[in-house]
């Protein structure tokens, strides 16, 4: 099988396919762009950090790469509930690329080619191979498209534009035409990136410092990482001001977005600075996070300040910001427009309904973000390889993972703008925490051939430790005097009486370290595992309620819909429901119920019809 593209999606797709034993080739326009970070030099964040943990639990590469190349680590949302805790790290952009390139080079059964793919070979509705710019022809049973923003890429800075992918890469225009000819429903999306500036031109004394978490609190992304972690750099925060906003508004028509040059739809949850100023006119300031791009470079990334305004305007509005008065722009901000597919034309396996054997991943599927891309890449590569090998493919239901939620949203609801994973998109987020991704997904990764012996042994060892400690906490009793002394020492009002450790941990003010101070730490229990156990105990009632809801939803998921089912014959359905059900062709009643425009009464009518049909 073949993977087109070696960005975050392509890396995971190629690695997964080769790990499964499929003879695999990955094609990239440049070996120097493998694992490139064309936007922010970071991994993780709210919901995204959970995706990385899930990817790692399934046997992916991103978590290991982030642990090996991080500069600073922070756990976001620590003041909120565990469902939204999110690990985020600053990474060394160059070292991340080198790690990923080497990881692919070391993957058995994987061939790497520097070549532009200009066409697909399709015969009788099934992919047969690819053609490169140098007229190379390669046959394959399955192909994964992981094209990022290169597909029909067009860069905009003010009224200037040129055909290009990110970071000066070539635009893949010929491949776009080949995909259109094959009948894939393409659309135009847009994203953007801020300027990169020289460290020496920033007055850090006028900015807010944003340090990482204390070293003794740092957690890795990968369940395989045991090495101690240490923060290496600080990040900083600057703020726009009314003068910044005036400069932007005075020049807003020079923005290709507002001047009508850009037709692609931009990301709703990652707007440009000009979008922020226009849409949030009542705000006096917006934060800009100043982040290093690496240890051996002076480039700094200005997160929150992407723009497509002309260079002279960029210079003016950046220099109006306190601490940026002498700013030197090394790379100007730009917007990039690109082609992607309507994801409702994909199966839940990420295989195209139009061209069989063709899979999509990442921004090609209408998503934004490295983490979303990587997670889809693993699933697409896994399923393409299993398809090529004649094995059953993997579909992850929503309740199993954020990855399952993401894919279900894409193929069932579709997207109107670049899709970003958020905790609010999951109705099961209390059970889909980042700390238990291994329990949820590593057995699945093992069953489907991705999880190797070393990871499986580590997983089983961790599960044994957790289970032993659950039993100990269930049985251990804390005497009243011991508990009162521990609570007094912790500055808490002493409890009236002692009790079973597990029951005591249900109280919001009592934490594992306090209990362990009395009965001792469990064998093999780390602070990370202790926090996980405490979360399970404190939220047991809510988790049980979600489990019941999952079982109820699973009933709908088991009600399958025949592929040739005629929705047009069901006069009880609304016209909108009939049209959308016919176009999307849901696999089961559960998926049908999540299609926008399909009402509960439509689902009830469909359920009756399916019962009669069987």
Give the ranges of each region predicted by the language model.
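An anion/pyrophosphate-binding glycine-rich loop and adjacent beta-alpha core
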Residues: 30-32, 48, 75, 176-315, ...
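A glycine-rich dinucleotide-binding beta-alpha-beta segment and adjacent secondary-structure elements
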Residues: 301-367, 395-408, 526-580, 585
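Extended, charge-enriched "interface" segments that sit outside catalytic cores
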Residues: 425, 431, 437, 442-604, ...
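Active-site-proximal substrate-binding core of FAD-dependent oxidoreductases
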Residues: 33, 193, 351-354, 385-418
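Conserved N-terminal/central alpha/beta ligand/cofactor-binding core
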Residues: 15-123, 134, 146-163, 170-175, ...
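Beta1/beta-strand and adjacent pyrophosphate-binding region of the FAD-binding site
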Residues: 1-9
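Core beta-strand elements of the Rossmann-like FAD/NAD(P) dinucleotide-binding domain
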Residues: 133-142
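Internal hydrophobic alpha-helix adjacent to the cofactor/substrate pocket in enzyme cavities
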Residues: 19, 55, 373-396
């Amino acid at each position: 099988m073949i993977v087109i593209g070696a960005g975050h999606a392509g890396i995971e797709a190629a690695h997964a396919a080769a790990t499964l034993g499929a003879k695999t080739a990955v094609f990239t326009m440049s070996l120097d762009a493998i694992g490139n970070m064309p936007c922010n030099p970071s991994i993780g964040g709210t919901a995204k950090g959970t995706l990385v943990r899930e990817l790692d639990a399934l046997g992916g590469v991103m978590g290991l790469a982030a642990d090996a190349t991080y500069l600073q680590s922070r756990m976001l949302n620590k003041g909120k509930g565990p469902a939204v805790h999110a690990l985020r790290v600053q990474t060394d952009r160059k070292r991340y690329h080198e790690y990923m390139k080497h990881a692919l080079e070391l993957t058995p059964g994987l061939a790497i080619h520097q070549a532009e793919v200009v066409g697909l070979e399709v015969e009788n509705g099934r992919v047969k191979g690819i053609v490169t710019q140098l007229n190379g022809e390669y046959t394959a049973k399955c192909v994964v498209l992981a094209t990022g923003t290169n597909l029909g890429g067009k860069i905009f800075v003010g009224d200037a534009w040129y055909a290009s992918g990110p970071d000066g890469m070539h635009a893949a225009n010929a491949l776009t035409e080949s995909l259109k000819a094959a009948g894939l429903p393409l659309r135009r999306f847009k994203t953007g990136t801020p300027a990169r500036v020289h460290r020496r031109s920033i007055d850090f004394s006028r900015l807010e410092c944003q340090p990482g978490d204390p070293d003794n609190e740092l957690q890795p992304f990968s369940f395989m990482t045991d090495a101690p972690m240490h923060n290496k750099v600080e990040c900083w925060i600057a703020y726009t001001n009314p003068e910044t906003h005036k400069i932007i508004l005075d020049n807003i028509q020079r923005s290709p977005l507002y001047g009508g040059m850009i037709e692609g739809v931009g990301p709703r949850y990652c707007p440009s600075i000009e979008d922020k100023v226009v849409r949030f006119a009542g705000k006096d300031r917006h934060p800009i996070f100043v982040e290093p791009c690496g240890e051996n470079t002076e480039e700094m990334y200005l997160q929150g300040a992407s723009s497509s305004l002309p260079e002279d305007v960029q210079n003016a509005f950046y220099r109006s910001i306190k601490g940026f008065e002498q700013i030197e722009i090394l790379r100007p901000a730009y917007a990039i427009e690109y082609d992607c597919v309507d994801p409702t034309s994909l199966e839940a396996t990420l295989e195209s309904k139009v061209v069989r054997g063709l899979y999509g991943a990442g921004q090609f599927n209408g998503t934004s973000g490295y983490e979303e891309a990587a997670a889809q890449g693993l699933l697409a590569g896994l399923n393409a390889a299993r398809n090529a090998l004649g094995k059953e493919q993997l579909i992850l239901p929503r309740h199993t993972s954020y990855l399952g939620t993401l894919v279900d949203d894409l193929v069932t609801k579709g997207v109107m703008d670049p899709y970003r994973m958020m905790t609010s998109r999951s109705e099961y987020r209390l059970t889909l925490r980042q700390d238990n991704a291994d329990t949820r997904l590593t057995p699945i990764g093992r069953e489907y051939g991705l999880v190797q012996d070393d990871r499986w042994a580590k997983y089983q060892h961790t599960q044994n430790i957790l289970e032993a400690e659950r039993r100990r906490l269930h049985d251990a009793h804390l005497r009243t005097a011991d508990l009162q002394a521990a609570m007094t020492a912790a500055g808490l009002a002493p409890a009236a009486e002692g009790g079973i450790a597990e029951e005591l941990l249900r109280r919001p003010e009592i934490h594992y370290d306090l209990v362990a101070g009395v009965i001792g730490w469990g064998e093999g229990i780390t602070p990370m595992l202790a926090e996980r156990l405490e979360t399970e105990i404190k939220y047991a009632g809510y988790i049980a309620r979600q489990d019941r809801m999952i079982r109820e939803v699973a009933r709908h998921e088991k009600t399958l819909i025949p592929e040739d089912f005629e929705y047009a014959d069901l006069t009880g359905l609304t016209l909108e429901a009939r049209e959308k059900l016919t176009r999307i062709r849901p696999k089961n009643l559960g998926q049908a119920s999540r299609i926008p425009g399909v009402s509960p009464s439509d689902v009830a009518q469909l359920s009756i019809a399916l019962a009669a049909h069987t």
